[in-house]
Amino acid sequence: MARIAGVNIPNHQHTEIGLTAIFGIGRTRSRSICSAAGVEFSKKVKDLTDADLEKLREEVGKFIVEGDLRREVTMNIKRLMDLGCYRGVRHRKGLPMRGQRTRTNARTRKGPRRAAQALKK
């Protein structure tokens, strides 16, 4: 298994698909990394030479990926919450922040339904 950016890339996959195992790299960025490194993206990871892997590591190093990207996203959300802007408040309350309806639906963001309380008469 090749190790790039602290992630083990599966040997049996094509380079284009294997690079997507790294957080922050999708198919498009994977293709651009392969072309910039001069590596054929249809080549299997196990068939890559050490020189190819080094070129890929160098190209991936130009982007913010894995832990740094996760930290940046978390800090961006925290900044919104500290500002007290609309999006930050919605993050804090655990509600959708992009204008979706919440009277019904929004179950993914709100979590499972709570049991209804019995009314006393």
UniProtKB/Swiss-Prot annotation:
| Cross-referenced PROSITE patterns | RIBOSOMAL_S13_1, RIBOSOMAL_S13_2
Q: Which organism is it from?
A: Burkholderia vietnamiensis (strain G4 / LMG 22486) (Burkholderia cepacia (strain R1808))
What name goes with this protein? Small ribosomal subunit protein uS13
Q: Where is this region: Disordered?
A: 93-121
Q: What GO biological process terms does the UniProt entry carry, in alphabetical order?
A: translation
Give the protein's biological function.
Located at the top of the head of the 30S subunit, it contacts several helices of the 16S rRNA. In the 70S ribosome it contacts the 23S rRNA (bridge B1a) and protein L5 of the 50S subunit (bridge B1b), connecting the 2 subunits; these bridges are implicated in subunit movement. Contacts the tRNAs in the A and P-sites.
SUPFAM superfamilies in alphabetical order: S13-like H2TH domain
Q: Highest lineage ranks of the organism?
A: Bacteria, Pseudomonadati, Pseudomonadota, Betaproteobacteria, Burkholderiales
User: What family, per the record?
Assistant: Belongs to the universal ribosomal protein uS13 family.
Q: Subunit structure, per the record?
A: Part of the 30S ribosomal subunit. Forms a loose heterodimer with protein S19. Forms two bridges to the 50S subunit in the 70S ribosome.
Q: Which GO terms describe its cellular component?
A: cytosol; small ribosomal subunit
Supply the gene name.
rpsM
